C-alpha cells in the first residue's frame, strides 16, 4: 500500500507539476501544467506521425453540434445522460451538445465527396477534445475526467477489408503499448452486447452475433488471450477493450477498437462498387493510444515519475560547480536546446550536493556538471 501511495498519479503528478485541480473550475476538469503539456505534446507528435506513416489522413471538426446530429447517430436516445446539453428542446429553437465522440463529424467528412470502392479504406484520424458528463463520485485525478483529449479515428472500409483493417488497428495499439513499455501490463476484452437488454442497442441479433464471432476469431488468430464481457459493448457494435489497472488495482480502459456494421446506414453512407452500384461500407472506431490524460496518469504510476528520456519534461540539467562557470553553462544549455534537448541551468548559490539532490528529486535523467575541465 505504501508503494501504491508513492506512485499514485493523483499525488505524484501534482508534486511533479504535471497537473493540478481547482475547486472553482470544477471536478473532472484538470489544469495541465507546463510539464504535463510537454509530455502530452510529445505523445501527440509521436502518435500523429505514426498514424500518418500508416495511411491516416487528418481532420479537424467542431467541439459541438446540434442535437439533430446525435439523433441520427442514436447517441441522443442511448447516451444523452452522458452528454453536456446546451439549451432546452421545449423552449429553444436549436439545442446543441458538446461532443462526447468524433465519429458523426468524420462521417460527414466522408459524405462531403462521392467515393469509389477503389478509394477504400479511408482512415481518418483526429486528436479530439471530448466532453462526457461523468458522475461526480467517479472523478479521480487524470483517469476519470469530464474533458479529455483522445487519439481518435474512424476507418471507412469495404466489408472484404474489415478483418485486415481491424487487425491492423490492433497492431497499431500494440506498437504504441510497446513503445511506452507497458505492453505486459494490459488485458484484452471482447465487449459484447447483452441480448437480454435489447433496448440498449441498435441492430438485430444476427448482426451482433456475426460481428462478435469475427472479433473472437481475430483475437484467437492473433494468439491474444482475452475475456468476454457481456453488456460492455457500445450501443452500435462490439469492441476490443484494452485495459490496465492503476496502483490500487482498479481497471480502466486505455484503448478501444470497435466493429460497426450499423451506423453507415444511419448516416446513409455509401461507396460505388465495381458495377456502379451503391454499397454500404463498414466502420472501425478506434484509438491508437486512447485518452492522453489517462495515459499520462498510467505512465506516472508505471514509472513513478522516472519517465523514458524522450518523454521527460526536463531531459538535462546543467550544474556549474561555481559562479565562475555560469557563462559556460549557459553556452552548453544553448547548444543543447539548438539540438532539441529540453534542459535548464541551475545557477543558484547552493552547494553542489544540494543541487544534485534537487535534480534527482525532480527526476531529471541527466545532469551535466561543468567546471574548468569541461570548459577547456
PLM features: residue spans?
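NTP/phosphate- and nucleic-acid-binding module
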Residues: 1-376
Amino acid at each position: 500500500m505504501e508503494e501504491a501511495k508513492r506512485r499514485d498519479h493523483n499525488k505524484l503528478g501534482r508534486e511533479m507539476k504535471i497537473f493540478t485541480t481547482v475547486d472553482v473550475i470544477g471536478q473532472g476538469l484538470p489544469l495541465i501544467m507546463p510539464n504535463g503539456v510537454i509530455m502530452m505534446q510529445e505523445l501527440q507528435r509521436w502518435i500523429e506521425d505514426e498514424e500518418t506513416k500508416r495511411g491516416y489522413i487528418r481532420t479537424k471538426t467542431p467541439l459541438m453540434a446540434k442535437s439533430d446530429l446525435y439523433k441520427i447517430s442514436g447517441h441522443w436516445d442511448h447516451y444523452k445522460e452522458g452528454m453536456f446539453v446546451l439549451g432546452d428542446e421545449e423552449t429553444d429553437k436549436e439545442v446543441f451538445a458538446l461532443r462526447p465522440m468524433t465519429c458523426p463529424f468524420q462521417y460527414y467528412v466522408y459524405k462531403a465527396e462521392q467515393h469509389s470502392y477503389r478509394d477504400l479504406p479511408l482512415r481518418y484520424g483526429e486528436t479530439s477534445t471530448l466532453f462526457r458528463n461523468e458522475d461526480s463520485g467517479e472523478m479521480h485525478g487524470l483517469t476519470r475526467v469530464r474533458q479529455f483529449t483522445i487519439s481518435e479515428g474512424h476507418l471507412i472500409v469495404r466489408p472484404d477489408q474489415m478483418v485486415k483493417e481491424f487487425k491492423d488497428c490492433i497492431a497499431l495499439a500494440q506498437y504504441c503499448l510497446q513503445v511506452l513499455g507497458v505492453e505486459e501490463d494490459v488485458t484484452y476484452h471482447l465487449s459484447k452486447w447483452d441480448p437480454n437488454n435489447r433496448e440498449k442497442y441498435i441492430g438485430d441479433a444476427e448482426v451482433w452475433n456475426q460481428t462478435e464471432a469475427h472479433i473472437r476469431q481475430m483475437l484467437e488468430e492473433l494468439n491474444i488471450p482475452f475475456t468476454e464481457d457481456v453488456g460492455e459493448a457500445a450501443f452500435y457494435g462490439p469492441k476490443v477493450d484494452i485495459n490496465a489497472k492503476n496502483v490500487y488495482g482498479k481497471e480502466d480502459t486505455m484503448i478501444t477498437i470497435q466493429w460497426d456494421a450499423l451506423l453507415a446506414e444511419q448516416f446513409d453512407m455509401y461507396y460505388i462498387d465495381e458495377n456502379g452500384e451503391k454499397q454500404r461500407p463498414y466502420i472501425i472506431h478506434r484509438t491508437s493510444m486512447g485518452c492522453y490524460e489517462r495515459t499520462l496518469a498510467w505512465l506516472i504510476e508505471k514509472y513513478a515519475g522516472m519517465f523514458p528520456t524522450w518523454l521527460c519534461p526536463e531531459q538535462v540539467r546543467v550544474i556549474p560547480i561555481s559562479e565562475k562557470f555560469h557563462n559556460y553553462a549557459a553556452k552548453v544549455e544553448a547548444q543543447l536546446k539548438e539540438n532539441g534537448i529540453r534542459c535548464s541551468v541551475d545557477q543558484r548559490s547552493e552547494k553542489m550536493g544540494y543541487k544534485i539532490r534537487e535534480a534527482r528529486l525532480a527526476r531529471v535523467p541527466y545532469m551535466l556538471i561543468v567546471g574548468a575541465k569541461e570548459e577547456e
